[in-house]
Amino acid sequence: MIHPTAIIDPSAQIGENVKIGPWTHIGAHVKIGDYCEIASHVVVKGPSVIGERNKIYQFSTIGDDTPDLKYQGEPTGLVIANNNVIREGVTIHRGTVQDRGETYIGSNNLLMAYVHIGHDCIVGDHTILINNASLAGHVSLGDWSILSGYVLVHQYVHIGPHCFIGPSAIILHDVPAFVTAYGSPAEPRTINREGLKRREFSAEQIVLANRAYKLLYRRGLPLKEAVKEIAALGDDEVITMLLTSIRNSTRGIIR
């Protein structure tokens, strides 16, 4: 059902069984997939592609121009996959031509009230961003990671999969896979043991992850030496995840 007060641009493509509430504005070059629910007073601008079964709550602004001063009105994009919940007052900006030209959000994510996703961000699957968490431009957030309320993430930071970031933390450097971080600026605390349990990693894998963490953070080793010793632990998934996130770091990891 589309409310009669909703304003929908003629170029917008609306899928089947989509609900659009009163006073919502769907702009030009927007594609909305089947079974989406968009509440009242939402603004969706394009070019944007929104997949299936996404639920967007009131007063959110999706796909607006980036405030990046380099942006000159280029037709950059936003892609949101499937089964996401986007709560009240969330803002998500499109990309810039200086980067990928696209902001991307995966599937099965929960963005709580007043979350901000900046231009050119890449958000994986199954993440949770709690109220007022903010990603600056060009940030990458790995699958299954959780950002607590009021977390601020500096531009270009990469946060690996299965991370947990504590309340009001300020993230200035990359966070390796399954690491928990707290503070301002954030510092590593331990492995995300509870998160790994919930994702059904075995007890042996969690022990292995903890051994790798201690090599990285508790032995006082130079990073290259720590990476070498972690690699010697084998090729289990947790080791591969950790090494990949360290080797892909562009800003240096938190230490």
Predicted features and spans:
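Terminal amphipathic alpha-helical/low-complexity segments used for targeting or macromolecular assembly
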Residues: 1-5, 10-11, 16-17, 53, ...
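Structural signal for interior beta-strand "rungs" in well-ordered beta-sheet cores
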Residues: 1-187
